[in-house]
Amino acid sequence: MPSYSINVGNVELVSVSDGFPTRSPLMPFPDTTIEQWREFPELMKENDQIGSRYGTTAVRSGGKLIIVDTGLQAADGILMEDMKAKGVHPEEVDLVVFTHLHPDHVGWNLTAGKPTFPKARYLIPQRDWDYWTKPEVVKDAEHIRNQVLPLKDHGVIEFMGDDYQITDELTAVSTPGHTPGHVSILIDSQGERAYILGDVAHSPAQAHYTDWCPIFDVE
């Protein structure tokens, strides 16, 4: 099995990249110190930088091809290229499921004004939609206006409530905090379980320093 793919019971998960930028860990975690980060040499790169990852997880479950989040679509974004290299083709995607609606999770929703995944339904957590579409929030959220609201005009959105059953093996469970409507995806198949966490945590270092919260957390 390729290193970018794992199975959880009958469910196949394929990790797809949209890029691996580096940055100072003090940018997302301004209340920490470089000395604290140096306690985790396996996380550190040159010049006291840490790696980041944009991308998606492709999931095959119950005869469906599902994409969890759609990356950032920066100028140097590679999501489409990496998907095709790993045998994941946009025109075959049945469902696009969002853990939340931050810019680096909705970037490839549309291409040239049309849904990037043409036959897919786009599943959005209802609570996150309610938050991001508030007038006082959406006016400052260009990514919502450009990459999320047009999906409604295309008629491809479905909303997920609490414990939303995506397939018999996948459930969207509420994990608020990073955003008010954030969800994680529980995979439960053939006695095996795993989670696609979304942005519940941003670094393995948070398992040690459990009080570290990145500036991106809304709550």
Task: List the predicted regions and their residue ranges.
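Metallo-beta-lactamase
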Residues: 88, 92, 116-174, ...
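Short secondary-structure boundary/capping segments
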Residues: 5, 49, 58, 113-114, ...
